[in-house]
Amino acid sequence: MSCIKNSFEALKAKNEKALVGFVTAGDPDFGKSVEIVKAMCEGGMDVLELGIPFSDPTADGPVIQRSSQRALSSGMSLPKVLEMVKIVRGFTKIPIVLFGYYNPIFSYGGKRFYEDALAAGADGVLIVDLPPEESAELTSLWEGDDFDFIRLVAPTTGQDRMKQIAGEASGFIYLVSMTGVTGSQGLDSSKVADVNAPLKAVTDLPVCVGFGISTPEHVKAVAAVSDGVVVGSAFERLIEENLENRGLHTMVQEYTESLKAATRG
């Protein structure tokens, strides 16, 4: 059984929903990024999404685009992301999901990526721009059930397409709360419930909702209609606004604690 599946089952037993946190690996630099992740873990994060910096992150809003630029400017690369995973795995047991675009993974080599990510301590991957019909060649290189492939479902996805995506997914499904790019505003939890219901009809996998979630109130509302909540741009905004602030570690930890408290039933 995968680490991700174990984690969701343990949370369900405690009547809690998962808090999934995203940060770009290497933002603003390698050392500070490790400390930021440590603060998230100390704050009670359940699942960590580590973004692989990319020069053309088209699905992301300006906040995460700038985080990618800062990470790349500091010398971050996919091999260094995997090095960071090893370090993070040394101080936490929570699932680590690598989050990014296909180009860096393709350049690195699919089989090599799987083997090195697994060896580093990663538990899965979410590739934003790789739909199921284009991913068979990559996933055929992977063996066993210890490395999950998380899939995205949009609010505009039809029932048949949902079923296809869910059939190709493992770990959990990332349900996008609204159309647009990461960091978009205008969250409506009732619309999330409307999309989640048909999705849950075709899969037993946990469904985690992201895009536009930044406050404990958002988390509480979305957690009531899903299995987990993804917060990304809000973490990156906090980092961006406090790049030179020595209290950033404490700020990230306390922010994480406030979000996590809202996931408890």
UniProtKB/Swiss-Prot annotation:
Its EC number is 4.2.1.20. The active site is at E49 (proton acceptor), D60 (proton acceptor). It is an enzyme of class 4 (lyase). Disulfide bonds: none annotated. It catalyses: (1S,2R)-1-C-(indol-3-yl)glycerol 3-phosphate + L-serine = D-glyceraldehyde 3-phosphate + L-tryptophan + H2O. Pfam families: Trp_syntA. GO terms for molecular function: tryptophan synthase activity. GO terms for cellular component: cytosol. The keyword Lyase applies. Pathway: Amino-acid biosynthesis; L-tryptophan biosynthesis; L-tryptophan from chorismate: step 5/5. SUPFAM superfamilies: Ribulose-phoshate binding barrel. CDD domains: Tryptophan_synthase_alpha (cd04724). It comes from the Bacteria. Transmembrane segments: none annotated. Keywords: Amino-acid biosynthesis, Aromatic amino acid biosynthesis, Lyase, Tryptophan biosynthesis. InterPro entries: Aldolase_TIM (IPR013785), RibuloseP-bd_barrel (IPR011060), Trp_synthase_suA (IPR002028). Gene3D superfamilies: Aldolase class I (3.20.20.70). NCBIfam families: trpA (TIGR00262). Tetramer of two alpha and two beta chains. The alpha subunit is responsible for the aldol cleavage of indoleglycerol phosphate to indole and glyceraldehyde 3-phosphate. Belongs to the TrpA family. This is Tryptophan synthase alpha chain. It comes from Desulfatibacillum aliphaticivorans. The gene is trpA.
